[in-house]
Amino acid sequence: MKKYIMSIGICLCMASCLNDGFLDVDPKDRQTEATAFSTYDNFKTYAWGLYNIFYGYGNDQNMNYFEDEYNADNMIRAVSGFESQYAYQTARVEATDTEHWDYKYIRRANLMLDNIDGSSLTETEKEHWRSVGYFFRAYKYFMIMSDFGDIPWIEHVLTDESPELYAPRDSRDLVAKNILENLQYAAQHIKAEGDGENTINADVVNALISRYGLFEGTWRKYHGLQDAETYLRASVEASEKVMANYTTLHTPYDELFNSEDLSGVEGIILYKKYETAQLCHGLTRMVRTGESKIEMTKDAVDSYLCSNGLPIGNVNSQYGGDKDVYAQFTDRDYRLYFTVCPPYRVNLTGAAATSTGYELTGNAQDEQFINLMAQISGETYHRLPTLNFKGFYVKEQPHFTSYNWSTAWNASEMGFWMWKYYNIHTDCTNATGVNTTDAPLFRLVEIL
């Protein structure tokens, strides 16, 4: 009997040891926190997912890119049901806002930050990845705070029992202060060159401090809040650091928004890369069809300076006046011409809806901006006359929708067709979005 008892005891002991060992083994078919955050490359792989916060030109073909603008006063979308919800007083505050009040991304950043100290990284490497995590978390908090003001500040991954789930919102003062402190830490401790080309580095962090400090500083100044100078000073200091490393602006201006490759382009600090069959957008195609219905307002056009740098209301601006669109566009800042299509007229050599050829009219006014755009824009960028996504010419701008030329594309209700993202070199054949022009995220011109 003793033999049996001893044998059972030995088996139980061995089974206990085996079970303990089995329970301590990490699964080999999926990542856990213990395996996902161990080496430098682990953190690098995880951090790639955080870059998805940059919207760029969006994915596929949708109009979300312009939503903030046509809900403001710079643009309209001439489609029933898409009028400015603020101008028409139809805006509603939803009880649950999953688009803006979204802490899932904060949790993703906190998950990485919580696992840095327990990793096998060197202290310098830990500082780098802590800086990357701080950058992305601050970027998201900046977005949420700008919408809501007072919000909860969460620094660690929460559980179902975490008291923070039921805590009141933290003050804007606290959140704003924490955002700035996180970014300033990141600027001091991140690897200067980041993790290679087009990754978060010291210049990108300082570019965000510049943007954030200006926003928060001016908000506080004009809303009577304290510490405005703290944020404005931080913006200036960060801007100066960026300008020390970036000294040249790229020209022509329109290439910044219509290039297939922004790597190495002067003044581009960070951009979103698009690649065929991997990540595409439909912005260029929408501009070259009748689908977007996006156009600029007269107020937005009037905000552009004249060629001598003066606003149109200045007596010395030499503004041509409002007698016709040619006068409105003469001697203006070139950025207007790259954003709103200048006026022109040609004679088509084929049918109005399918002409692949044209002839000049011989009228100097009709050809004024055809000649100018040929001088200041590249061959496949903002040249006149314009082409739709199938390569058919439009005979005239402004092309009012009321003209009923059997061509709905490149048209507008008010005469100011927005063509900033127009080019004829990116693929526009597919309505699901196959455009691959890169989207600038941080530019030197914003810092200046």
Segments predicted by a language model, with ranges:
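Conserved, well-structured interaction surfaces
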Residues: 38-58, 78-148, 164-197, 330, ...
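Elongated scaffold/linker segments in the mid-to-C-terminal portions of large proteins
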Residues: 41, 80-82, 89-97, 251-444
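Sec-dependent bacterial lipoprotein signal peptides
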Residues: 1-15
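Short coil/turn linking the two alpha-helices of tandem helical-hairpin repeats
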Residues: 145-146, 150-152, 194, 212-224
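Beta-propeller blade signature
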Residues: 238-239
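Membrane-proximal, proline-rich intrinsically disordered regions
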Residues: 17-64
